[in-house]
C-alpha cells in the first residue's frame, strides 16, 4: 500500500508511493545515494523463471547473463537470444557478408508476466523504453531496398523494430516507450525472420512467435 516501507538487503529501504494501472509501483528510496548505486548493492540478477526456479543466483551470473552488445543500464532482463553471439562468431559472420546493427530496448518486468486474461485484448502490456537512431534506421531500410533480409535477434529486437515501422514497411527513428503486443493476425512490417529461444506457454512472447509462424 502507499506509505508502506520495504526493507531490501544491504540496508536499503524504500517507501511505496504510487501503484500504476499496469500493476507496477513507484518507490522512493531513502538516503542520498543515487538509485543506481542502491540497486547495484541490493539487487540480484533477474534470471528467467526457468532458471531461477531451479537454483539461486550466483556471482558468475552477472557476467554470464549479459550479452556482448550490452552498453547501457536500464533493462531488467537480458535479450537472451543474443547470448549465443561471441566476438569470434560476429567476425565469422562479417566475413561471409552478414552485417549487424544494434538498438536499445530497456526490457521491463512485464516480460516475465504470463497472460492471465481469457481474451488477449484484455491483457495489459507494460511499456518499455527503446531507441533506434536515424542512421541505424537508414541502414536497415537500405538492406531491404537492396534485396537483403532483416533477421531480428530475439523478440526484444523484433518488438522495437515493429514499433518503429510504418505500414509501408519502412523503419523510422524511434525514441520512447512501446507497449506493442503482437498476437496471431498481426502483419509484420520490419523484419523477415527471427532468431529466438524457447518461450513459456501462455506468455506474450510465445504469442509473438505464433504470430510470426502464422498460427
Predicted stretch roles:
Residues 1-215:
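Surface-exposed, charge/polar-rich loops and edge strands
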Amino acid at each position: 500500500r502507499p506509505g508502506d516501507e520495504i526493507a531490501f538487503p544491504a540496508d536499503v529501504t524504500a517507501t511505496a508511493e504510487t501503484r500504476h494501472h499496469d500493476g507496477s509501483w513507484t518507490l522512493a528510496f531513502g538516503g542520498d545515494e543515487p538509485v543506481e548505486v542502491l540497486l547495484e548493492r541490493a539487487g540480484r540478477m533477474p534470471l528467467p523463471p526457468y532458471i531461477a526456479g531451479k537454483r539461486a543466483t550466483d556471482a558468475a551470473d552477472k557476467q554470464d547473463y549479459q550479452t556482448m552488445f550490452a552498453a547501457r543500464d536500464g533493462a531488467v532482463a537480458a535479450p537472451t537470444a543474443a547470448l549465443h553471439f561471441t566476438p569470434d562468431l560476429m567476425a565469422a559472420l562479417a566475413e561471409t557478408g552478414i552485417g549487424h546493427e544494434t538498438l536499445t530496448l530497456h526490457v521491463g518486468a512485464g516480460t516475465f508476466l504470463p497472460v492471465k486474461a481469457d481474451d488477449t485484448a484484455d491483457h495489459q502490456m507494460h511499456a518499455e523504453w527503446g531507441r533506434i537512431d536515424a542512421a541505424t534506421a537508414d541502414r536497415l531500410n537500405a538492406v531491404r531496398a537492396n534485396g537483403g533480409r532483416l533477421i531480428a535477434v530475439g523478440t526484444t529486437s523484433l518488438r522495437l523494430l515493429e514499433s518503429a515501422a510504418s505500414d509501408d514497411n519502412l523503419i523510422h527513428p524511434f525514441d520512447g516507450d512501446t507497449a506493442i503486443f503482437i498476437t496471431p493476425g498481426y502483419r509484420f512490417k520490419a523484419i523477415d525472420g527471427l532468431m529466438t529461444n524457447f518461450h513459456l506457454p501462455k506468455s506474450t512472447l510465445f504469442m509473438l512467435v505464433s504470430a510470426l509462424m502464422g498460427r
